[in-house]
UniProtKB/Swiss-Prot annotation:
Family: Belongs to the chromogranin/secretogranin protein family.
Modified residues annotated as Sulfotyrosine in this record: 150
GO cellular component terms listed in the entry, alphabetical order: extracellular space; secretory granule
Protein name: Secretogranin-2
Gene giving rise to this polypeptide: SCG2
Source domain of life: Eukaryota
PANTHER family hit by this protein: SECRETOGRANIN II (PTHR15119), SECRETOGRANIN-2 (PTHR15119:SF0)
Subcellular location: Secreted
Biased composition (Basic and acidic residues): 92-104, 255-283, 548-560
Amino acid sequence: MAEAKTHWLGASLSLILLIFLLATAEAASFQRNQLLQKEPDLRLENVQRFASPEMIRALEYIEKLRQQAHKEESSPDYNPYQGVSVPLQQKENSDLPESSRDSLSEDEWMKILLEALRQAENEPQSSLKENKPYTLNSEKNFPMDMPDDYETQQWPERKLEHMRFPPMYEENSRDNPFKRTNEIVEEQYTPQSLATLESVFQELGKLTGPNNQKRERVDEEQKLYTDDEDDIYKANNIAYEDVVGGEDWNPVEEKIESQTQEEVRDSKENIEKNEQINDEMKRSGQMGLQDEDLRKEGKDQLSEDVSKVIAYLKRLVNAVGSGKSQNGQNGERANRLFEKPLDSQSIYQLIELSRNLQIPPEDLIDMLKTGEKPNASVEPEQELEIPVDLDDISEVDLDHPDLFQNKMLSKNGYSKTPGRAVSEALPDGLSVEDILNLLGMENAANQKPPYFPNQYNREKILPRLPYGPGRAKANQLPKAVWMPDVENRQMAYDNLNDKDQELGEYLARMLVKYPEIMNSNQVKRVPSQGSSEDDLQEENQIEQAIKERLNQHSSQETDKLALVSKRLPVATPKSDDAPNRQYLDEDLLMKVLEYLNQEKAEKGREHIAKRAMENM
């Protein structure tokens, strides 16, 4: 029992001690952790004082290397297993059992530990380097507080003396540094090897002998030839220097050849330069040539048109001078027109009008002429003819006053008024009569009454096709195309009364005196015929008779007469409507100029486009 009690007491005491030790250890560790958290420098110092197990392994490996070095010094013979690389040795050391690791004595272990501790003191940051991963930035591996340079690491002298690092990149058979030197020293030429070398050299000499002799002969011949040439040239140079004064002597043939070559080169260079200059001139002059071509073409066209117009004018002047005009007014007006010299500007205007209006120059001049008639057999002119009854005039005729005038045919079959495609080409508010009035000419419709169905002998006249630059004047239409229409028109106006003629004449004279009833856009001037005193007396009598008749008529009939009078041509003296004509002429002139400018711009663009297409 006593033994059991003592056993329990001992166990209890041991438990108490154990609990006390654990409590003290925990308290100490708690205090230490608090200190380490507050002061990290102290933690580093404590860590650096104790060697890590990796450091101990490294020290063991170093000691083994040292022992191997001592063994190599004692036994210089070659060890084939000595050339194993460092990682293989580390593997072998790691594979060794613990019993072999513990084979070291206690004194050696103490020495190793002391050296490790000294090394840890000298290198305070070595443990941090081993524990932390390696980074590219070397500044982060070394703290800023470190006063010593990393190159001032002091290794033990004994360790530096005895450390032998095996080469990593050589073969295992050459790991021993003494091997090659020993082989070189031990190698010696034997008499057998010397004999073989001599025989090899002799055979090589036999093979290369004849070739060398041939080469030597060729070299000797060349040397002799060059020596002879040098002697000849030296003599020539000496003689030439005496004459010329020290200049190099060259044969005459070489000089001639060099001169000819230089001349050929100069001529080639000059030819190339001239070709380049010509190409540049052609390139620069292409645009100028195009402009010149355009100008020449325009001038040629103008000259052709001018020649045609002048030739036709000459023919007309000759016809006027030879023939006698039945109408005195028309002859006087024609003489006045052709007595004035035509300037170039008016001719160009006539040409532009003939192009833009698509009217031949002959018909355009007929419109400008006053009273010339192409044929001698001309029927006498008739007076103004008015229908018997005013109701017979249809609304179509009233709305289109120029209907009969447009249907008249010229001597060549062209209408003298813009009743065809000409009016479509002209802008609004313009007519051929307005353009001719601007030019200072009188229209043929103003000098001849528009209602003359039998003006010419139509049996002798044939119409002509519309004007075009590519059409021949010989293309003519048959008579049956237009003769029935003319006969119908002639029959329509055969049944006119004398009273209606007198009434029409009187209305025309009244409208001359009172022009305000007429529309300004439809004013058409007809020259008043020169009347004698007898005519004036007759007119006065007619006026009185018509006034009495007008008083008897109702207001409706007077309105109808006024409408008819608007459609009839009116004789307006130049002295009465001079201011109105001035304003009308100015407006019409602006319209004509705008129209001509537009036509010129369009034609110029078309011409340039055609030229560009041709050049392409």
